[in-house]
Amino acid sequence: MDHRHKVGGYVKLAKLWERSKDAAVAYHSSYYAEKFRDDADKRLVSVYIDITGNKEIYKRPEMVHLLKDCKNGSVNLIFSQTRAYLAANTCDFCFLLQYLFDMPMRVDVVTDDDDQRIDTILDVDNQRQSLKELAEKYTSIRRKDYLEWRIRLEHEMTKVEEK
């Protein structure tokens, strides 16, 4: 049985990158391929790149695709260069975490930034549990908003083609 992490690399770029889309896709695809090339514990499944002005997670086609792949078990590790790529604000970040923590199978999150590094695999200082508690507390306060967000996200997932 393969116990390696199945990695989905995620990048969210501003709309202005549309002009240089091919170069951006090539660069980020190469970055992730190189990052996981010799990692025996992690296998890169796909790189998901959104070039959009949309801040909301459910309006980003590749993020929706990535979350659908997490839900169906194709990906169990979301890797992003920065936390900011994952979510534009605290609300979306907490909703995203809650959605991931609610999945029946474990999905980890790792970011590569020094300032706000997330690594739920290494779990330094019990980071995974702390993030889970943060997400649960936030979504309990904004339960109705979270449920509406989740419904929108899952509706968008039904439109996603398999990669």
Language-model features and meaning:
Residues M1-E148, R152:
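Short, structured surface patches at the beginning of a domain
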Residues K144, R152-K163:
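Amphipathic alpha-helical coiled-coil segments
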